[in-house]
Design a protein with these regions (language model features):
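Residue at a conserved register position within TPR or TPR-like alpha-solenoid repeats
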Residues: 24, 61, 139, 183, ...
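TPR alpha-solenoid repeat register
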Residues: 53, 164-171, 182, 215-216, ...
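Structural motif corresponding to the intra-repeat A-B loop/turn of tetratricopeptide repeats
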Residues: 27-28, 64, 87, 142, ...
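Short coil/linker segments at helix-helix boundaries
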Residues: 60-181, 197
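Short coil turns that delineate tetratricopeptide repeat
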Residues: 46-49, 105, 160, 211, ...
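Structural register within alpha-helical repeat arrays
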Residues: 20, 57, 64, 128, ...
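Start-of-domain marker
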Residues: 14-73, 83
Length: 292
């Protein structure tokens, strides 16, 4: 009985924490203060499994972001840091709402799945899609590259969520060309801080999403080379060769170098001969063949 009473008291205490955080959010307390209040409830099993718990800090972040949008429009921002602080709210807002979404589905007494907050969460994502793109661009321009990487990543992830496809269909910012170029920009942000694996992943995602400009292959190859990822460099060069091999011999050079380093002379000859067949008037190809 004592144990049962103790568990009940703990659950009651955690619910009180949630209510305190809700009250602080409604009073317009700083987001960091709301998070500080509710943090114990986010790790307690009695409350962490409830979507309502995660909604509190998520909503607080979005609400404060929206309020700052109005301040920005009224030219109340004093410096760049004000913009950075505003943009930085969007990342935890998304993360908390995703936590809420993950635990929002419950099974009712009839055995049917039921949600409480999902619609609000998804509607909020739709309404803030463009904000994530702008935040990424602003944070990048302020040289907050790690944070720009996160904001760009959230923008991309939102456009790929099946639940949002219909709602975003009429939003020009969700067009494939915008999304794929954002993935490229995300890669550039990672490259700026030498997060080479993340940069390569973003560049490859850009290609997957339809961004096939020459620069994405060139950046991806440069990053792969800097990271010492020769197999990745070889793979990217193979993808770029059919598209841009005629205007730039670096791709066939990388391919043949890969084979030569592993003493695979047959495939090195095969690769350059195929390139010559595709573009017999390219004198650089014969130079490469002569080197082989």
């Amino acid at each position: 009985m004592a144990i049962a009473l103790g568990v009940a008291a703990c659950a009651t205490a955690q619910m009180s924490v949630v209510k305190d955080a809700q009250r602080a959010a409604k009073e317009g307390k700083p987001f960091s203060e709301v998070v500080g209040i509710i943090t114990p409830a986010l790790t307690n099993p009695e409350t962490a499994g409830s979507s309502d718990t995660w909604m509190v800090p998520g909503k607080a972040a979005y609400d404060q972001y929206d309020k700052l949008v109005a301040n920005k429009q009224l030219h109340m921002f004093k410096n760049a840091q004000d913009t950075i602080n505003q943009d930085m709210l969007l990342v935890p807002a998304y993360e908390y709402y995703m936590k809420a979404l993950a635990v929002d589905t419950i099974i009712d007494k009839k055995g049917k799945p039921k949600t409480k907050n999902s619609k609000k969460i998804l509607d909020t994502f739709v309404g803030h899609l463009n904000d994530y793109y702008m935040a990424g661009a602003e944070l990048y321009n302020f040289q907050k590259y790690d944070d720009a990487f996160k904001a760009f990543g959230i923008f991309i992830d939102l456009t790929q969520m099946p639940q949002l496809k219909k709602s975003l269909a009429s939003n020009p910012m969700a067009a494939d060309s915008i999304v794929s170029s954002t993935a490229f920009n995300q890669g550039i942000a990672a490259w700026q801080v030498e997060r080479f694996d993340d940069a390569i992943g973003a560049f490859m995602n850009a290609i997957k999403l339809g961004y096939n400009k020459k620069q994405v292959y060139d950046y991806a190859m440069a990053v792969a080379q800097a990271a010492g990822k020769n197999d990745t460099l070889f793979m990217i060069a193979q993808e770029a060769l059919p598209l841009y091999g005629k205007e730039d011999t670096q791709y066939i050079r990388q391919i043949t170098n890969h084979y030569l380093q592993s003493k695979d002379y047959d495939n090195a000859y095969k690769a350059i001969n195929q390139a010559i067949e595709q573009d017999p008037a390219n004198p650089q190809y014969y130079v490469v063949k002569g080197i082989i």
